[in-house]
């Protein structure tokens, strides 16, 4: 009995493959579309990549012949959604974006805009890498939430925007922090200052304020005597900024030690009349 089932399955499989291969070689657009639609619907319902890949290949074969025809909209959507469902988000992002631009009055426009944005969200890399796709995702998600305030994906899109913005924020912070940790003081001061200015409500700002102060302090005490006072006074300014904003900071003990050393150095410079 088991052999019978295996034989029957093999026959069906061969018949299915034969039908697909025959369609690939055919010039009959309607036949290709009918079979592609069958594969597509099964693939979507059962999340079968093999069926969707077959649908994609057939649909991409016939799409050029459908340009300017009503069926082009249907085929364009099916291709984009098939790529989206199999998780090929680089292509689905591009495909849905092109669909939205080509068919702005489509009843599926909201879905297309969100799925394009979500595709870029899915390919957004970790914070330490190039963030081009992150910026694209933010632009597209923001466009979606502006256009569809009552949209089906509005809440999720806003949550995704928060995730992506936090990623960019962390990247900016890590770049500035690394300058401090690598003891490149002057660029660190500049980068940390920019970070604070660009991200006024950041969860990293306590660290950023302290590292900015510490960078200025070390930069100052390693300066020539003629310019040390001015740089120390700037360090005092950054110290005051830090302690006024974070009086209970975990860095307070270290900050106070630096401040005492600054005061001692300023007193010494006063004695030298510099």
PLM features per residue range, with description:
Residues 2-8:
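Sec-dependent signal peptide recognition
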Residues 5, 16-274:
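Acidic, polar-rich low-complexity tracts and alpha-helical solenoid repeat scaffolds
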